Design a protein with these regions (language model features):
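Juxtamembrane loop-transmembrane helix junctions in multi-pass integral membrane proteins
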Residues: 6, 10, 14-17, 39, ...
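N-terminal transmembrane signal-anchor/hairpin module of polytopic inner-membrane proteins
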Residues: 1-16, 180-194
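Membrane-embedded alpha-helical segments of multi-pass transporters/permeases
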Residues: 8, 12, 60, 141-145
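Conserved post-catalytic alpha-helical subdomain immediately downstream of the catalytic base
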Residues: 123-158
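Interfacial loop-to-transmembrane junctions
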Residues: 106-108, 145-172
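Hydrophobic residues within the alpha-helical transmembrane core of Major Facilitator Superfamily
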Residues: 5, 31, 56, 92, ...
């Protein structure tokens, strides 16, 4: 159901171009990641390990074939996005380990962010990290409400896997990342409104 609707959305957004089957494959992987992480608290390496080089290859294809409709058309930005996504989430996890004596996220999250960085590049990696934080807050809000206002007296800490938030943010960036970045830059006055 969900995957079929997302496939339809990809086709409607990208049309009959090279981007459509590539983004359908990416979406299918992100749906799998979401449900596996929700159930098992793991993100399959079988998706992230091949996904990182595939994203870089797609950036190269888009450089050669601009009509592909792929968003990213720079191998340098693809590699930079993968590196930044991985290192930033790893850094946040290390900070959490030092400050709170526990991991803030797992290695699967780092690799998933690297994969999305490879597909969408440096600027969209920043967007995906920001969006995933907002998505995580939205997903956690019912749990937080129940714990503090719903009479749940359980003293155990609440945990929610971060992979689904990253996956949802990646899908948002795929559909409208460039428009969101452009809108933000216009809002802060970094570029003239067009």
């Amino acid at each position: 159901g969900i995957t079929g609707l997302l496939f339809l959305g990809v086709y409607l957004r990208f049309g009959f171009t090279l981007a459509t089957p590539i983004y359908m494959l990416l979406v299918a992987g992100l749906v799998v990641v979401t449900f596996v992480d929700l159930v098992d608290w793991t993100i399959p390496n079988e998706i992230t390990y091949p996904g990182i080089p595939l994203g870089i290859v797609c950036a190269g294809l888009a450089t050669i074939y601009p009509a592909s409709n792929l968003q990213l058309q720079s191998i340098v930005s693809s590699v930079a996005g993968a590196a930044m996504g991985y290192l930033l989430l790893k850094g946040l996890d290390m900070f959490s380990l030092i400050a709170f004596k526990k991991h803030g996220m797992g290695m699967g999250d780092w690799k998933l962010m690297a994969m999305l960085g490879a597909f969408f590049g440096f600027a969209n990696t920043i967007l995906i990290i920001a969006l995933s934080s907002f998505v995580g807050i939205a997903l956690a809000s019912p749990m937080i409400y129940q714990k503090y206002f719903g009479g749940d007296e359980d003293e155990n800490p609440m945990y929610l896997p971060f992979g689904p938030s990253i996956a949802i943010a990646g899908i948002i960036a795929m559909f409208c990342g460039p428009q969101l970045i452009q809108g933000y830059l216009e809002f802060v006055g970094a570029v003239p409104q067009g």
